[in-house]
Amino acid sequence: MSFQLDTSTHGAEIRNVYEKVLSGADDCSWAIFGYEKGQGNILKVVASGNDNDEFLDEFDENAVLFGFLRVKDVNTGLNKFVLVCWCGEAAARKGLFSIHMATVSNLLKGYHVQITGRESSDLNMDDIIRRVADASGSKYSVHTSNSTPQSKHNAFYDASQTFGSTAKVAPAPAPSTKTPLANISKPVVQAQKDSKDNSWDDSSKQSNTQTANTTSNLRVPVNASWSDAGRKEKSQENKPKPTPFGSGGPSKPTPFESHGPAKQISVQPSEHPKPSISTTTTGSSYRSAESSHAPTTPDHFKLTPLTKLEPQPPSGSPSKKPVSELEELHTAGNVNLSARRALFEKKESSTKNVENPVSHHLKSPVRTSFPPASTTASKQDSPSTVPVDKQETAKPINKQVSSNETSAQEEPRESVAALRARFAKANVSENNDPPTFPKTAAKISSFNSKAGTSFAKPRPFTNNPNPISAPEKPTSGESLSLNPPPAMPKVFPERDISSASQKAAQPSVITPSVPQPPAAPVVPEAPSVHQPPAAPVAPEVPSAPQRPAAPVVPEAPSVPQRPAVPVVPEALSVPQPPVAPVAPEVPSVPQPPVAPVVPEAPSVPQPPVAPVAPEVPSVPQRPAVPVVPEAPSVPQPPAAPVVPEVPSVPQRPAVPVVPEAPSVPQPPAAPVVPEVPSVPQPPAVPVVPEAGQLNEPVVPPLPPHDETQEPQVGGDVKATEHTQPTKTPAIVIYDYSPEEENEIELVENEQIQILEFVDDGWWLGENSKGQQGLFPSNYVEITGPNETANNPPAEPQAGGPGKSVKAIYDYQAQEDNELSFFEDEIIANVDCVDPNWWEGECHGHRGLFPSNYVEEI
């Protein structure tokens, strides 16, 4: 016997209801499946509907059911599906539940949550909705442009965007310099993703998403107006496109430095376009791409002062007060002024009176462990330029923070070599797309054009399977990309690989980057957590030397572990129970077929005999009753089927009146009784009816025609006692038509000769036509001297032939061969044919009567 669940018998109906729930039909939001009645392995649809309360009411504790429910996710507003597997406390055949549950789970695919219950407290609609919400994994809503973070940013930005005034906004405190660079968190500049006018490209949107999920240890006010870039696009149309600026490593926009007195650039409103510097080319101010990237020497630091390269403000400028380049960049909406003012002003004040800024920066011991640049520009620079920028940009943070009092208007200029080294280091992540800084890029481009240098434009970010491949070589006219890098974590592995390839070209200053590889293998997993957009923050690293690479590491492995946890228990729960509980129920199944096989079929004719038993006490049993079972052995006439009616003969209406009736046995004439049911009873008057009024009795079955058999008469008398060798005359009292070939026809009042008393119910005789055969003994009456042979009596208990008795009770004949009489009447010619039944004459009629109804005279 198979214990597998049958889903094909009602497969079409199951599929239709299941598809209705999946398709979101209004009239069907749930369906319940159960077993067909009487068939424990056939699955069918039990109920369906759209009321969730009715869904929970359908689960009965006496059944095993499977439910499929559609609910609305409160987080996303989408339709979610729930599979409910129910095994009631009082359900039968619980052992097959786990096997069938696995089959139903494969059949009803597409569910999000599976719930197993066994009592009503296990199923609650609020709990089901909560589980669906927890399983969705999204417990946030989409922010609009009017969100709270944007309002805070606007308030802060409005308070700090007045650049012409002398008021300064206090910068956020910088973290301690003891914090390792590897643990510096990413600044939260990307919190401006909810800006009203965010027309940046996809890279900025990607970076916004990353920063929203990144925790920052740097307490920097969120006031970088990334959205201002969109507003400035129209004003920048007349300006040349800024040179792209890519930064995957630590870099910062710094004021220009020179050996001469520093000129300050006055900030003009965006509606006054500035003259293009990067596009103004002269033969003496530019060098070829090949020469610009050739190895540099200390002679590069001896350049013409940058005062000659600075653009002059428009003649119509409303303010002549010089401002710093940092404020100008903030005007373009691309710099977090409040966060960086303290960092840059310290540098401006410290380098104001220094003749050689390079030698001054070389004294700083900080940031020696930061990985070197690995891009094309850094490879082609001289070894001296990389450490210069490396140490120049890595001043102690304490000094930078303490320089908040320094005026931003005093800005020394950097040398060309320092700028080139810093830009090359900023271009370390050529696969990233940093945000665009229009005015900063313009100044860098103009500076390069004057200094005769150019930088290669890094390739766009791609999922390069081979990060060891060398980057493209720069070409003349190309500029650094200014798109936001997609992922800061991607920068570290490339730096490590590229640093290994640059050991020959760059001296011991690059070696500090070797300790970084431990963080590399963990960070590549971060892109799956959507961290790529954090790269745009790279240019702001100088403001706070802390990096959040460490906190990101534990989050990456935790994300893939969540989906694996719920799957394991469900998979293990399916294969456990299929074998054990099924065994005890196997023997119970084959038993029912044994019950329907009715072995009592042959006993069907016995029920009629059963009622005779209780009624026997009421009427004396006839001696012929035991002879009835022998009739089937002889070829029976058509009346044989009537034999089962013999039990009804013993019933007598007068029996309840007679206390002695229970002890009366049946007379030997009982075989004749079967035909009585078809004949009405004679009148109660003791007057003997005429022969024409008597009804024909039922023919008893023929006894087996076997001469060797010794038939019994009266239950104890052998056939030899009543078998006569001579003919005995008899008269026919009823007409009889033969139904078998060995029978003869009898006509009423016809004289026949009895040849042999074969049985109490059948005799062998010869009619007036000379035909010999069997005939019913109760259809004739013996008239000759051998009259007693008709019913050979047993040993008479009282008297002999011609004896008379007196009736002591009224008796109504139940059969045609019985005698009716009233109390005190005399019955003559009594023959004691049986101890319980006697034969006598009364009112001109002869018949049988119970012996306990009379007394001897």
Curated annotation (Swiss-Prot):
Residues 193-204, 229-240 have a biased composition (Basic and acidic residues). Residues 6-133 form the ADF-H domain. Transmembrane segments: none annotated. Gene3D superfamilies: Severin, SH3 Domains. Keywords: Repeat, SH3 domain. Residues 276-295, 371-385, 399-409, 443-452, 498-511 have a biased composition (Polar residues). One of its GO terms (cellular component) is actin cortical patch. Residues 725-785, 800-857 form the SH3 domain. CDD domains: ADF_drebrin_like, SH3_Abp1_fungi_C2. This is Protein app1. It comes from Schizosaccharomyces pombe (strain 972 / ATCC 24843). The lineage of its organism: Eukaryota, Fungi, Dikarya, Ascomycota, Taphrinomycotina.
